Amino acid sequence: MADCVIRDWQGKEAGKATLDLKVAKETTANDLMHRAVLRQQAHARQGTASTLTRSEVRGGGRKPYKQKGTGRARQGSIRTPLRPGGGIVFGPKPRTYNLAMNRKERRLALRTALMARVEDVTVVKDFGTSLEAPKTKEITDALGRLGIAADAKVLIVLTEPSDVVRRSVRNLEKVKLIAANQLNVFDLLHANALVLGEDALATIQEVYGDD
């Protein structure tokens, strides 16, 4: 269980919230989160890289020159891997990089990652609701008021990010905005600072706090 300070859009304290999630044992936590990150990165790979073997390359059916009498090494095809334009030996073929991890482990890894970063969490009440039009400076100023460094990698988690907030954030290279139902281990561990909307915190507690 961890207590989080709730701040308003101006960075002033506006209350407190509690995050109570079941986490993995200390002896297995690092391994569990590591496997979850590996799985997420592996699933992001397309696995479509493909090369042609000597049997698949077009041409090469005719013997390039006679077997004997030329003084050169014997050759049976111009598509041998020894020649330019020939087939590839042991090259990549389409494959799946998917790694298996059951649902219970995935949820436990996510809860463990979030609780491990709880000291870097800032809960904000009504994040961005006062924005009338997309304005990047409003977001950077708000993050500054929350005490987040300008060069920090920031993950903002909202229940239903508005279009205004999305457009205000998209030009910030080190700021990533995701919905609460898109929460993942990699983003939680990769960011230097986590900004959660008050409603997003409630959603996370509701969805992941029942195990």
Swiss-Prot record:
Biased composition (Basic residues): 60-71
Source organism per UniProt: Parasynechococcus marenigrum (strain WH8102)
Function text: One of the primary rRNA binding proteins, this protein initially binds near the 5'-end of the 23S rRNA. It is important during the early stages of 50S assembly. It makes multiple contacts with different domains of the 23S rRNA in the assembled 50S subunit and ribosome.
Disordered as annotated region, ranges: 41-87
Protein name per its UniProtKB record: Large ribosomal subunit protein uL4
Superkingdom as given in the UniProt entry: Bacteria
Keywords for this protein: Ribonucleoprotein, Ribosomal protein, RNA-binding, rRNA-binding
UniProt-recorded Gene Ontology molecular function terms: rRNA binding; structural constituent of ribosome
GO biological process: translation
rRNA-binding found in the keyword field: yes
Annotated InterPro entries: Ribosomal_uL4, Ribosomal_uL4-like, Ribosomal_uL4_dom_sf
Quaternary structure and interacting proteins, as annotated: Part of the 50S ribosomal subunit.
Example of a GO cellular component annotation carried by this entry: ribonucleoprotein complex
Pfam family for this entry, one: Ribosomal_L4
